[in-house]
Regions:
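Generic, well-ordered alpha-helical scaffold segments in large soluble proteins
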Residues: 18, 61-65, 160, 164, ...
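A generic secondary-structure boundary signal that marks alpha-helix termini
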Residues: 64-71, 166-170, 187
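Conserved Walker A/P-loop ATP-binding site and its immediately adjacent core
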Residues: 154-156, 174-193
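Charged, low-complexity intrinsically disordered regions
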Residues: 1-29, 44-45
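Short helix-terminating capping/connector loops at secondary-structure junctions
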Residues: 137-140, 172-178
């Protein structure tokens, strides 16, 4: 019986699912300034908020990784997630696929589509992913994720920089927040933003 594991796994989807499932608990642990900053940018709480939904969701994930997770390297978050430790100790044992389907992590599929228990195969696959992530780590983890063209990356980046400066000013000794930013603006459109 030939067995294959899933090839459409994306860790950011697991982070997003974890955040959505625990959003209230996570946001309650943010400091007051962060909660006010998010509320100001959230159209559900502030109808006059400037950010559109995809921008706000990206900002929420940025703050989640920065403040709740402690700004770790991606490989560290992935290792904690796959081993269900620290922040992920109470995480569910399933993963969300790109098509929205949920599958158990410890299962794979045979070539004819049947699900089989594969803890060793899954462990091998996640170990390979972990090693790749660790290989490409940066000295200072700082994450800006891709948004499609025209969705407002410039405004989002400016909002993230403002968040960084706001918290760096309030908590100057907290190494999670940057105190400097270098911005290159190639044309007038970016400068107007």
């Amino acid at each position: 019986m030939a067995v294959q594991t899933t090839d459409n796994f994306a860790f950011y989807e697991q982070l997003q699912h974890y955040y959505q499932a625990n959003r209230r608990k996570i946001r309650s642990r943010y400091n007051d300034l962060t909660r006010k900053f998010l509320a100001y940018n959230d159209r559900e709480e502030n109808p006059a908020a400037f950010l559109r939904l995809p921008q706000f969701e990206a900002l929420e994930m940025y703050v989640f990784i920065k403040e709740f997770m402690g700004n770790p390297q991606v490989y560290q978050m992935f290792d904690d997630w796959r081993n269900r430790r620290d922040r992920f100790a109470d995480a569910s044992y399933y993963s969300v696929q790109k098509d929205g389907q949920i599958s158990l992590l410890d299962f794979g599929r045979t070539t004819d589509g049947r699900q089989v228990y594969l803890p060793d195969e899954v462990e091998k696959q996640t170990d390979i992913l972990f090693k790749q992530m660790k290989k490409y780590k940066e000295k200072y983890p700082n994450y800006i994720y891709a948004l499609t063209m025209g969705l407002g990356k410039t405004i989002l980046m400016a909002t993230c920089i403002f968040y960084e400066f706001l918290l760096a000013n309030k908590y100057p000794r907290d190494k999670r927040f940057c105190h400097n930013a270098l911005v290159f603006a190639p044309d007038k459109t970016v400068l107007q933003s």
